Amino acid sequence: MKRILLVTALAVIGGIAIGAWFRPTPGNKPPPAPAAPTFTSQEVSEAKANVCAAYQKVHHANELGRSLYLGDDQVAKQTVAVGGWLALDSGSRYLTTALVDEPATPPDLAQAVRKLANVYQLLAVDYMADVSHPEIDSARQTEKTVSASIERMCA
């Protein structure tokens, strides 16, 4: 009988101890969320200039690839196509890296550049997967619209 009382008492004490261990205390609050970073107008201006320069470089590379015409030679056509896929893929990563490196980029510009990077990735995969023209045309139209928006913001 004493054993049962001892085991019961230990179980009750253990339960209370475990409950107290997990009970939040007034001083045990989660830390407050960090405040959004603030940037000076100079930092924002420099970030915008750098991201716009990155966009111009990628846009130029993609335009060069699209303007090449090497006749009817199938090997030349495939070479140009592979170069275009690489320009889209590396361009999307370059733009994403530019945004990471420039946290002071204005939010509307950052959002547009992210969208363009996503469209470039989609186009690269669609071209490699030989997706139908209507799907590619839709992505190309989105690319044109977003590019025009970025160019207005960078002007």
Where are these regions (language model features)?
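Alpha-helical rod/repeat scaffolding segments in eukaryotic adaptors/tethers
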Residues: S41, Q74-A81, A129-I136
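Alpha-helical segments in soluble extracytoplasmic regions
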Residues: E46, N50, V58-P103, R140-C154
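Solvent-exposed, amphipathic alpha-helical segments
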Residues: A54-D72, A112-D126
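Extracellularly exposed regions in secreted/surface proteins, prominently low-complexity, repeat-rich
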Residues: Q121-A155
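Long, amphipathic, charge-rich alpha-helical segments that form helical bundles/coiled-coils
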Residues: W85, D89-S90, T96-V131
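Extracytoplasmic/periplasmic mature domains of Sec-exported, cell-envelope-associated bacterial proteins
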Residues: F39, L109-A112, T142
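Hydrophobic single-pass membrane-targeting/anchoring helices
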Residues: M1-A33
